Amino acid sequence: MKFAQFKRGYVLTVFVIVSATAHGEEIDRGVLIRLSNALVKVEALAADGALSLGTGVTVAPGRVVTNCHVTRNAENITIMRGGLRWRAMKQLADVEHDFCLLSVPRLDATPAEIGKAAALAPGQPVSALGFEGGIGLQIRLGKITSIYLHDGNRVLRTSTPFTSGASGGGLFNKAGQLVGLLTFRQRGTDGNYFSIPVEWFVQSIDNLPGYRAVAPLAPGLKAFWQRVQDKLPYFMQANSLAVDRRWVQLLQLASRWEQLEKTSIEPWLARGSAYAGLARPDEAAVSYQAALKLDPKASEALYGLASAYSQQGNSEKYKSAEQQLRLINPDLAQDLANEISLKQPRSIPSKS
């Protein structure tokens, strides 16, 4: 646990969790201070007295972005930072994509620098900042684990854990630029934490006619990730099936998915994962090779291909795929090496 003292007696409590995939990288203290100055706590008070707590990121003078699932029932929204409180007067809501932009006059907070989710790749380090539990601001370090195309942009999956109260918090790249909003998590192992991309809301920040007086949003509207199981985006359905180790059903889903998105690598990655789960490395390798034909620099496909070659016991092809991966994504290549060393601590046997 580390502590950093800020102006007005504001103490930022930072719990830094560095996963093995972050390779010991730390955030520069100056960057840490700059990021913390953009984060605010969000209190959303409903007519029945119910209080919803979340996090927001200052994205322009007097403008804060958070998740709509934090503010959707609110009649009154309060923004807090450093012991001070401001009232949000207006909001621009996009419930489907789960972002709400808030107009907060006289807000004393430094806007975050905006980056691009589209510039990220699996394996790259990121940091997640949010008021977990509605108490102190916490920072989690991790990496991008997967990227999924949805509605023309990239939903980011990371290994940076977050809990209630952090919704609407910021996901930042290594340079300290805002690339996404911490939004939801799926049941499963580590790395099932998802952020919506900045590209979804950045063009709406200055859309003044789109802002309305703060009031409860229309009932019945749901974000894309809150739909019933068979209406969820394919990447979420695939993740649930993989968590449950329902490999045959995942293969069936991948087939339907591929018919709808013929130029996407995601169905092939899902197919490869299913074959790997079924201990069919030859077919897994074919699936990952198909993904690489669509995107020769797809590091997730190279990762899966190398892992399939390892399952086959083909050391020569494994080394070739691992070397290609290391050129494109050194962090992910190190993850692969760690995984293989755990499974086969001595060596990968040559194929007979």
Where are these regions (language model features)?
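Flexible, gly/ser-rich surface segments that form the specificity/activation loops bordering the active-site cleft
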Residues: 26-31, 70, 110-155, 162-166, ...
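Conserved active-site neighborhood of the chymotrypsin/trypsin-like protease fold
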Residues: 49-53, 60-129, 134-138, 152-155, ...
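N-terminal activation segment of mature serine protease catalytic domains
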Residues: 23-57, 64, 76, 214, ...
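Canonical tetratricopeptide repeat
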Residues: 270, 304, 338-339
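C-terminal cap/linker of serine protease catalytic domains
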Residues: 25-32, 110, 132, 178-243
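Catalytic nucleophile loop of clan PA
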Residues: 57, 162-182
